[in-house]
Protein backbone atom coordinates (compact mmCIF):
# COMPACT_ATOMS: atom_id res chain seq x y z
CA UNK A 1 0.00 0.00 0.00
CA UNK A 2 1.41 3.39 -0.97
CA UNK A 3 1.31 6.62 1.05
CA UNK A 4 -1.40 8.21 -1.11
CA UNK A 5 -3.85 5.40 -0.52
CA UNK A 6 -3.07 5.37 3.21
CA UNK A 7 -3.57 9.14 3.53
CA UNK A 8 -6.70 8.88 1.40
CA UNK A 9 -8.09 6.25 3.76
CA UNK A 10 -7.22 8.44 6.77
CA UNK A 11 -9.00 11.38 5.16
CA UNK A 12 -12.03 9.21 4.41
CA UNK A 13 -12.12 7.93 7.98
CA UNK A 14 -11.79 11.50 9.24
CA UNK A 15 -14.79 12.54 7.15
CA UNK A 16 -16.85 9.67 8.56
CA UNK A 17 -15.86 10.47 12.15
CA UNK A 18 -16.57 14.18 11.66
CA UNK A 19 -20.04 13.41 10.32
CA UNK A 20 -20.98 10.86 12.98
CA UNK A 21 -19.74 13.07 15.82
CA UNK A 22 -21.51 16.09 14.36
CA UNK A 23 -24.84 14.28 14.31
CA UNK A 24 -24.43 12.51 17.65
CA UNK A 25 -23.11 15.47 19.66
CA UNK A 26 -25.62 17.98 18.30
CA UNK A 27 -28.43 15.40 18.38
CA UNK A 28 -29.33 16.75 14.96
CA UNK A 29 -28.79 15.87 11.30
CA UNK A 30 -29.76 19.34 10.07
CA UNK A 31 -27.83 20.27 6.95
CA UNK A 32 -26.95 16.67 6.11
CA UNK A 33 -28.39 15.06 2.99
CA UNK A 34 -29.96 11.73 3.88
CA UNK A 35 -30.08 10.93 0.19
CA UNK A 36 -26.31 11.25 -0.20
CA UNK A 37 -25.82 9.01 2.83
CA UNK A 38 -28.22 6.43 1.38
CA UNK A 39 -26.24 6.47 -1.85
CA UNK A 40 -22.99 5.93 0.06
CA UNK A 41 -24.59 2.99 1.89
CA UNK A 42 -25.52 1.50 -1.48
CA UNK A 43 -21.99 2.17 -2.76
CA UNK A 44 -20.25 0.31 0.07
CA UNK A 45 -22.78 -2.53 0.13
CA UNK A 46 -22.40 -3.29 -3.57
CA UNK A 47 -18.62 -2.79 -3.51
CA UNK A 48 -17.88 -5.07 -0.58
CA UNK A 49 -20.09 -8.07 -1.25
CA UNK A 50 -16.85 -10.06 -1.34
CA UNK A 51 -16.21 -9.22 2.32
CA UNK A 52 -16.40 -12.83 3.51
CA UNK A 53 -15.04 -14.52 0.39
CA UNK A 54 -12.01 -12.49 -0.64
CA UNK A 55 -9.46 -11.88 2.13
CA UNK A 56 -6.52 -9.65 1.18
CA UNK A 57 -5.34 -8.35 4.54
CA UNK A 58 -6.62 -7.50 8.01
CA UNK A 59 -6.35 -3.81 7.14
CA UNK A 60 -8.38 -4.21 3.96
CA UNK A 61 -11.12 -6.23 5.65
CA UNK A 62 -11.28 -3.84 8.61
CA UNK A 63 -11.71 -0.83 6.34
CA UNK A 64 -14.51 -2.58 4.45
CA UNK A 65 -16.35 -3.31 7.72
CA UNK A 66 -15.90 0.27 8.93
CA UNK A 67 -17.21 1.78 5.69
CA UNK A 68 -20.28 -0.46 5.54
CA UNK A 69 -21.11 -0.18 9.25
CA UNK A 70 -20.61 3.59 9.44
CA UNK A 71 -22.71 4.22 6.34
CA UNK A 72 -25.66 2.33 7.79
CA UNK A 73 -25.15 3.95 11.21
CA UNK A 74 -25.38 7.36 9.53
CA UNK A 75 -28.52 6.41 7.62
CA UNK A 76 -30.07 5.08 10.84
CA UNK A 77 -29.36 8.32 12.70
CA UNK A 78 -30.80 10.46 9.92
CA UNK A 79 -33.94 8.48 9.17
CA UNK A 80 -34.65 7.03 12.62
CA UNK A 81 -32.78 8.27 15.69
CA UNK A 82 -32.84 11.99 14.80
CA UNK A 83 -35.53 11.91 12.14
CA UNK A 84 -37.28 14.98 13.60
CA UNK A 85 -34.25 17.14 12.72
CA UNK A 86 -33.89 15.90 9.14
CA UNK A 87 -34.48 18.67 6.58
CA UNK A 88 -36.38 16.74 3.95
CA UNK A 89 -37.78 19.95 2.47
CA UNK A 90 -34.35 20.86 1.09
CA UNK A 91 -33.05 17.33 0.46
CA UNK A 92 -34.96 16.99 -2.80
CA UNK A 93 -32.40 15.78 -5.34
CA UNK A 94 -33.86 13.08 -7.63
CA UNK A 95 -31.48 10.22 -6.84
CA UNK A 96 -33.01 8.01 -9.52
CA UNK A 97 -31.25 10.29 -12.02
CA UNK A 98 -27.99 9.05 -10.51
CA UNK A 99 -28.79 5.41 -9.75
CA UNK A 100 -30.36 4.43 -13.08
CA UNK A 101 -27.67 5.86 -15.42
CA UNK A 102 -24.80 4.48 -13.31
CA UNK A 103 -26.50 1.08 -13.15
CA UNK A 104 -26.91 1.00 -16.93
CA UNK A 105 -23.33 2.17 -17.46
CA UNK A 106 -22.01 -0.57 -15.16
CA UNK A 107 -23.59 -3.18 -17.45
CA UNK A 108 -22.14 -1.55 -20.56
CA UNK A 109 -18.64 -0.64 -19.35
CA UNK A 110 -16.95 -3.01 -16.90
CA UNK A 111 -13.88 -5.21 -16.57
CA UNK A 112 -15.72 -8.52 -16.50
CA UNK A 113 -19.39 -9.36 -17.06
CA UNK A 114 -19.95 -11.16 -13.75
CA UNK A 115 -22.38 -10.20 -10.94
CA UNK A 116 -19.71 -9.13 -8.43
CA UNK A 117 -17.71 -7.22 -11.02
CA UNK A 118 -20.78 -5.39 -12.34
CA UNK A 119 -21.82 -4.45 -8.80
CA UNK A 120 -18.27 -3.28 -8.03
CA UNK A 121 -18.27 -1.16 -11.18
CA UNK A 122 -21.71 0.24 -10.29
CA UNK A 123 -20.36 1.26 -6.88
CA UNK A 124 -17.45 3.11 -8.48
CA UNK A 125 -19.72 5.01 -10.85
CA UNK A 126 -22.29 5.78 -8.16
CA UNK A 127 -19.71 7.00 -5.65
CA UNK A 128 -18.45 9.53 -8.18
CA UNK A 129 -21.81 11.34 -8.07
CA UNK A 130 -23.17 10.35 -4.63
CA UNK A 131 -22.21 13.72 -3.12
CA UNK A 132 -24.45 15.65 -5.55
CA UNK A 133 -27.56 15.55 -3.29
CA UNK A 134 -25.47 17.06 -0.47
CA UNK A 135 -24.07 19.82 -2.69
CA UNK A 136 -27.55 20.43 -4.09
CA UNK A 137 -28.92 20.74 -0.56
CA UNK A 138 -26.23 23.25 0.40
CA UNK A 139 -27.04 25.22 -2.73
CA UNK A 140 -30.76 25.27 -1.88
CA UNK A 141 -30.25 26.38 1.73
CA UNK A 142 -27.57 28.83 0.67
CA UNK A 143 -25.07 27.83 3.35
CA UNK A 144 -23.46 24.98 5.27
CA UNK A 145 -22.42 24.65 8.90
CA UNK A 146 -18.67 24.80 9.45
CA UNK A 147 -18.55 21.19 10.66
CA UNK A 148 -20.44 20.05 7.55
CA UNK A 149 -17.92 21.95 5.44
CA UNK A 150 -15.07 20.12 7.19
CA UNK A 151 -16.79 16.81 6.40
CA UNK A 152 -17.14 17.67 2.71
CA UNK A 153 -13.55 18.92 2.52
CA UNK A 154 -12.22 15.70 4.05
CA UNK A 155 -14.22 13.68 1.51
CA UNK A 156 -12.84 15.78 -1.34
CA UNK A 157 -9.27 15.33 -0.11
CA UNK A 158 -9.87 11.57 0.11
CA UNK A 159 -10.86 11.39 -3.55
CA UNK A 160 -7.99 13.66 -4.65
CA UNK A 161 -5.44 11.52 -2.81
CA UNK A 162 -6.88 8.41 -4.42
CA UNK A 163 -6.19 9.93 -7.84
CA UNK A 164 -2.53 10.25 -6.84
CA UNK A 165 -2.75 6.65 -5.63
CA UNK A 166 -3.73 5.52 -9.13
CA UNK A 167 -0.91 7.56 -10.66
CA UNK A 168 1.57 5.99 -8.22
CA UNK A 169 0.32 2.48 -8.97
CA UNK A 170 0.61 3.07 -12.70
CA UNK A 171 4.16 4.41 -12.32
CA UNK A 172 5.51 1.77 -9.94
CA UNK A 173 3.20 -1.24 -10.34
CA UNK A 174 2.15 -0.80 -13.97
CA UNK A 175 -1.45 -1.08 -12.78
CA UNK A 176 -4.01 0.99 -14.65
CA UNK A 177 -7.76 1.00 -13.93
CA UNK A 178 -9.44 3.39 -16.35
CA UNK A 179 -12.88 3.00 -14.75
CA UNK A 180 -11.65 3.99 -11.29
CA UNK A 181 -9.51 6.84 -12.63
CA UNK A 182 -12.26 8.42 -14.74
CA UNK A 183 -14.80 8.08 -11.93
CA UNK A 184 -12.29 9.60 -9.51
CA UNK A 185 -11.69 12.52 -11.85
CA UNK A 186 -15.43 13.17 -12.13
CA UNK A 187 -15.80 13.12 -8.36
CA UNK A 188 -12.82 15.44 -7.83
CA UNK A 189 -14.17 17.92 -10.38
CA UNK A 190 -17.47 18.05 -8.48
CA UNK A 191 -15.54 19.17 -5.40
CA UNK A 192 -13.47 21.87 -7.14
CA UNK A 193 -15.91 24.73 -6.57
CA UNK A 194 -16.38 23.60 -2.98
CA UNK A 195 -12.59 23.51 -2.41
CA UNK A 196 -12.33 27.13 -3.55
CA UNK A 197 -15.13 28.27 -1.25
CA UNK A 198 -13.72 26.26 1.66
CA UNK A 199 -10.27 27.83 1.34
CA UNK A 200 -11.51 31.39 0.77
CA UNK A 201 -14.28 31.35 3.38
CA UNK A 202 -14.27 28.54 5.95
CA UNK A 203 -10.52 28.71 6.64
CA UNK A 204 -10.96 32.44 7.22
CA UNK A 205 -13.69 31.88 9.77
CA UNK A 206 -16.62 32.65 7.49
CA UNK A 207 -19.68 30.46 6.85
CA UNK A 208 -19.64 28.57 3.58
CA UNK A 209 -22.33 29.21 1.02
CA UNK A 210 -22.87 28.03 -2.53
CA UNK A 211 -24.54 30.11 -5.23
CA UNK A 212 -28.22 29.20 -5.57
From Swiss-Prot:
Q: Which residues lie on this side of the membrane: Lumenal?
A: 1-4, 53-58, 111-116, 169-178
Q: Subcellular location, in the record's words?
A: Golgi apparatus membrane; Cytoplasmic vesicle, COPI-coated vesicle membrane; Endoplasmic reticulum membrane; Endoplasmic reticulum-Golgi intermediate compartment membrane
| InterPro entries for the chain | ER_ret_rcpt
| Annotated site residue numbers, Important for recycling of cargo proteins with the sequence motif K-D-E-L from the Golgi to the endoplasmic reticulum | 193
One GO BP annotation here? protein retention in ER lumen
The protein's UniProt keywords, in alphabetical order, are: Cytoplasmic vesicle, Endoplasmic reticulum, ER-Golgi transport, Golgi apparatus, Membrane, Protein transport, Receptor, Transmembrane, Transmembrane helix, Transport
What GO cellular component term, any one, is given?
endoplasmic reticulum-Golgi intermediate compartment membrane
* UniProt region (Interaction with the K-D-E-L motif on target proteins), positions on chain: 47-48, 159-169
Highest rank taxon of the organism: Eukaryota
Similarity field: Belongs to the ERD2 family.
Q: What is this protein called?
A: ER lumen protein-retaining receptor 1-B
Instruction: Name the species this protein comes from.
Output: Xenopus laevis
Amino acid sequence: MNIFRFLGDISHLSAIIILLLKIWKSRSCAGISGKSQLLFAIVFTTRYLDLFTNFISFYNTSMKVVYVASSYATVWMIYSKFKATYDGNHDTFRVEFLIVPTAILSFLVNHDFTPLEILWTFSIYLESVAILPQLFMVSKTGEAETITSHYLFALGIYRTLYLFNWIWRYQFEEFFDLIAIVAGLVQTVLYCDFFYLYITKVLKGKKLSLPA
